[in-house]
């Protein structure tokens, strides 16, 4: 099993960053030809998801709609003032698994891997575990 940790610097309070290239680079560097790539976000106010990366309007729509579902101000009880970030992260999720074949991530032509920031800007970690098999 190979492991790497990526450092991600976000520049906005809410942001989706396409990290597909960095994840593929980790897979390539592992020399694993067939297996599973697990992506884990060790934060409670950030997430990871797979979505379309061909049209930037998809990211804009995603961000707009999740902000409607979970508004920043809504009478939350959590005293740190970032309850919405915790809720969004739990809804989107902290991990993804992607099949590796021939040393490449098996993804649809329009799919990309997105790091989702919900309480930025911050420096974040993305843990990538690559399992051969």
Each model region followed by its residue ranges:
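Active-site histidine-anchored catalytic micro-motif
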Residues: 1-133
């Amino acid at each position: 099993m190979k492991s790497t940790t990526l450092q991600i610097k976000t520049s906005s309070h809410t942001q989706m960053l396409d990290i597909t290239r960095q994840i593929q680079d980790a897979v390539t560097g592992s020399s694993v030809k067939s297996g599973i790539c697990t992506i884990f976000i060790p934060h409670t106010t950030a997430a990871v998801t797979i979505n379309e990366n061909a049209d930037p309007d998809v990211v804009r729509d995603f961000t707009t709609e999740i902000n409607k579902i979970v508004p920043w101000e809504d009478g939350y009880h959590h005293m740190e003032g970032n309850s919405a970030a915790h809720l969004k992260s739990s809804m989107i999720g902290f991990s993804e698994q992607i099949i590796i074949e021939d040393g490449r991530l098996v993804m649809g032509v329009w799919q990309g891997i997105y790091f989702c920031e919900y309480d930025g800007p911050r420096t974040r970690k993305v843990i990538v575990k690559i399992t051969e098999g």
